[in-house]
Design a protein with these regions (language model features):
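Structural motif
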Residues: 104-112
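Active-site beta-loop-alpha junctions of metal-dependent nucleic acid enzymes
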Residues: 12-35
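Short acidic-glycine loop/turn motifs at beta-strand connectors
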Residues: 2-6
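Helix-centered, glycine/charged polyanion-binding patches within enzymatic domains
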Residues: 18, 37-105
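Short, mixed charged/polar active-site loops
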Residues: 9
Length: 126
């Protein structure tokens, strides 16, 4: 999921449980509409790979993700920017408040995604 803030999801996709996050995240970045130039992209540590960071730069974003501690050439991250990532985590927490999402009652992907869309609309209206 790519979210603008604690209430606004821009895009999301459903992937198998064994699939890696980074390839799906790169695909979501490619699907984003045109956003203001040089806006910050707060990413989870799973997306700190070179390919994902380079794609973010190519699309005009400033990737904000801490480097892996064992990286040979780490980069600097402004901790104040990365702390804002908790806004996105709060969106995930509120979505998990919908029992149907966290327990995965739906057997079909289309039904799960439909309810996720409904839950996102409800959260945006709060």
């Amino acid at each position: 999921m790519v979210a603008a803030d604690a209430q606004t999801a821009l895009t999301f996709s459903l992937t198998p449980g064994q699939a890696g996050d980074a390839p799906a995240g790169r695909e979501l970045l490619r699907q984003l509409p045109d956003l203001p130039a040089r806006c910050r992209l707060l990413m989870d540590c799973a997306y700190e790979g070179n390919e994902t960071r380079q794609l973010a730069f190519d699309l005009g974003f400033i990737p904000v993700v801490p480097p892996h501690p064992l990286r040979a050439e780490p980069w600097k991250v402004k901790k104040a920017w990365y702390r804002r990532r908790n806004e996105i985590e709060r969106l995930f927490r509120r979505l998990k408040g919908f029992r149907r999402i966290f327990s995965r009652f739906d057997k079909l992907d289309v039904m799960f995604m439909a309810f996720l869309c409904f839950a996102l609309v409800v959260e945006a209206l709060r």
